[in-house]
């Protein structure tokens, strides 16, 4: 569905809406966008939660460790919320400029939903990122891929109310169904991850 093109969107909106360029990749831009979101999440964890985990292990249970841990938890919770907000704003501006309801190159919604799906495994990912190159690292990779696969499946399947909320105006309609898919993925990740981990032992 196309609408009358509107004012030109700022450059930042295009960067965010296209998932920093990942939405330009073909084929399956949504999958590329989700994969890029996973890599960005892993990089953020490698720069924050991974070094904190090592530091906390060496310093034991201290008030300072608890305070830093809470601050880091708040930061990691804020990330998918901030990404959702930015995705709505950016998609709104791009949709307004192009007159296209939900073009395939907009993958900021995949970034938001994927980060929501990844959030439950934040500490598992943080503590195991650097084990990928060690013997048995493929098992860690399989476990890390679980939120990615579940989110992509739910994003394509679109369980209720994903189809209904796609009718919301502008960026809300672009992003809302992916947020719901990410939220649906959370309980599945929490249930399936320990089962898969036990199978891979």
Question: Which residue ranges define each predicted feature?
Answer:
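Interhelical loop and helix-boundary elements at the membrane-water interface
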Residues: 2-36, 65-66, 86-118, 130, ...
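Short helix-loop boundary/capping segments at the starts of domains
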Residues: 22, 41, 45-49, 100
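Membrane-interfacial alpha-helical segments at the cytosolic side of multi-pass membrane proteins
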Residues: 35-45, 113-125, 185-193
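Membrane-interface interhelical connector segments
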Residues: 50-66, 127, 131-132
């Amino acid at each position: 569905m196309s609408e009358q093109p509107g004012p030109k969107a700022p450059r930042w909106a295009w960067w965010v809406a296209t998932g920093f360029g990942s939405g330009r990749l073909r084929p399956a831009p949504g999958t590329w966008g989700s994969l890029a979101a996973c890599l960005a999440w892993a990089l953020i964890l490698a720069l924050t939660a991974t070094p904190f985990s090592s530091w906390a292990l060496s310093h034991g249970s201290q008030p300072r460790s608890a305070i830093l841990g809470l601050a880091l938890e708040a930061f990691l919770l804020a990330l998918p919320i901030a990404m959702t907000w930015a995705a709505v704003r950016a998609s709104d501006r791009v949709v307004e400029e192009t007159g296209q309801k939900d073009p395939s190159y907009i993958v900021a919604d995949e970034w938001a939903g994927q980060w929501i799906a990844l959030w439950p495994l934040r500490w598992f990912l943080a503590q195991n990122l650097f084990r990928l190159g060690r013997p048995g690292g493929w098992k860690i990779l399989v476990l890390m891929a679980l939120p990615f696969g579940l989110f992509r499946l739910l994003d394509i399947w679109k369980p209720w109310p994903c189809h209904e909320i796609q009718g919301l105006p502008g960026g809300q309609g672009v992003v809302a169904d992916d947020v719901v898919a990410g939220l649906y993925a959370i309980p599945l990740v929490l249930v399936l991850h320990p089962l898969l981990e036990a199978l891979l032992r």
